[in-house]
């Protein structure tokens, strides 16, 4: 949902503009609707790119009616080679789109500085770009301004397509009449003012990008614009001798003047040059994607995000109205799940770039990680235990014996909301240490002792978060670590139980003060020993983890 600023639309922070939790910095670029600035999280230092859309310009272009639902859908886009939209902040004068920031700069600048890429590297980047284009086309979004300036590179030289954000949703029979984009990359039908449907113009632009990767120059270029237009409309371009004949045939098919004869994504995917060394995760297969079965979880998520009824969504699906934003959102959710599953399998079997999923890190010692949204930015360290914001202030803290984790590319707030929902469903009690750090406990009905664990959300990289499960052995460890209140009663009464009222919870907190000590002493002087057997705490911890993971996976 769009977040409204409660006070002034722009707040000053030490002379700098602040939007939400982000301090705006240098301008990264200027577009049709406004500027793109780098933003830095005021607490963590995490960088984002903030696109500023001027409401007056949006009104003048008559796109107010569709931009809200379109942006809502774009927030669902999750693809390893498309810049992600994290958050939208709305003010009376502007709309701020908080997006993924990558450090490698534009592909355009890289080519200008380093010249053409070798064939293998060109193919690798082109495969990534086409995968992103295909993902958006299947969800009724056309870019219309693909060019090396809109392809960004991350720290590992992987492609990230930017600026899908303001493209129109495609509809059958609805042609995109707006001639936009850079002439050098524009298809003949665009510059000549003819009607065009959308996907085919992205294919042309992708062909120009492929040529630039392989040759270091543009296929159509001239300082005199009328001459440039003639070259594009003639479709004749120079092919250097060093080019592979196979890739020349692909380029000629993609840069076909007649859009009806131009290559489709299916044609490109089946081309022998493109298929070589193609990672499976870029085009995952899913036999259930076109299934007529309705996914209840996806249906529920669409209703929550769009504040609509199930009947509205089902009506779009049953009527096969695939262009409706509700239907697009539904298929996006299912598609995201499919892509993540396929990508996980791929990355477990290969050595992937660090920029996507990072599941291979699970087999190595913990790398440096930065906690998300904590009160301070700690020094770089090497274990999850040391990175706990409270524990880091204390020396000699014993490392937890166990840690488990779930990785996700969802937004941090969404992850924690799902975690709290699952905890509530399991009837566990929990205490909020900070919005991204919870302590959870479950009472053993036999021994009346509590099994306790902590849940901490960590940021692994700019796209991935790790929900860390840690066993809490005893109250003494908690008190020393600074994560619990020194008084037992204070610690207990701060736990939340969804089944009780506040007064009931307070009464339970007082009575539980005794039961907390029952793990080491009996409730009275009788010889009954309720001390858990060695290892039982570990077993109960794993049971808690398993129950929670099962709910989260539903």
Swiss-Prot record:
GO terms for molecular function: [hydroxymethylglutaryl-CoA reductase (NADPH)] kinase activity; AMP-activated protein kinase activity; ATP binding; chromatin binding; histone H2BS36 kinase activity; metal ion binding; protein serine kinase activity; protein serine/threonine kinase activity. Its main location: cytoplasm. GO terms for biological process: autophagy; cellular response to glucose starvation; cellular response to nutrient levels; cholesterol biosynthetic process; energy homeostasis; fatty acid biosynthetic process; fatty acid homeostasis; glucose homeostasis. Pfam families: AdenylateSensor, AMPK_alpha_AID, Pkinase. The active site is at 145 (proton acceptor). AMPK is a heterotrimer of an alpha catalytic subunit (PRKAA1 or PRKAA2), a beta (PRKAB1 or PRKAB2) and a gamma non-catalytic subunits (PRKAG1, PRKAG2 or PRKAG3). Interacts with FNIP1 and FNIP2. Catalytic subunit of AMP-activated protein kinase (AMPK), an energy sensor protein kinase that plays a key role in regulating cellular energy metabolism. In response to reduction of intracellular ATP levels, AMPK activates energy-producing pathways and inhibits energy-consuming processes: inhibits protein, carbohydrate and lipid biosynthesis, as well as cell growth and proliferation. AMPK acts via direct phosphorylation of metabolic enzymes, and by longer-term effects via phosphorylation of transcription regulators. This is 5'-AMP-activated protein kinase catalytic subunit alpha-1. It comes from Pongo abelii (Sumatran orangutan).
